[in-house]
Amino acid sequence: SPSIFSTITSTGGGGGGGAGATNARSGGSGGGAAGGIPCGGTVGAGNTPSVSPPQGSPGGQGAGTAPAGGGGGAIDPGSAGAPGTAGAGGDGATNNIDGSSTDRAGGGSGSNGTGTGNGSNPFGGGGTGSGVPGTAGTTNKGGGGGGAYTPYNGGAGGSGIVIIRYKFQ
């Protein structure tokens, strides 16, 4: 879900694809598409709604015979799933606007259907994929949710965050 302050909106990450939603959800960082028969849906688009500078990248593609694709991150898109290998989530971005170095908006990994997602990407709050339902992205970090292999559901995207910094005189 997005976080809004006045006219500033920080879009949350997109959810990963899965049996309950073959097509991944779009967001600041797009979700990765599901893998496994009969899935292989469409990826989530990044930077949705479109703003400049962009808030994220698209997810990676899954396929009917391959594991799920990874979710897009702030910096890079998610990678596609391949036989035996889940797609990695795209890299998030680091900033220190709140006084400490924090990673945000990483893409969630895909699932290989038999265990943990090979492409786990904790960088920036992306959810990990697994042989069970995908994990949600971290709250207030805008990470994409982990993708899932049929018959499980993908994880929800993490909510965005708006941080206001000003100098008091």
What are these regions (language model features)?
Residues S1-Q169:
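Low-complexity, glycine/proline-biased repetitive segments and flexible coils/loops
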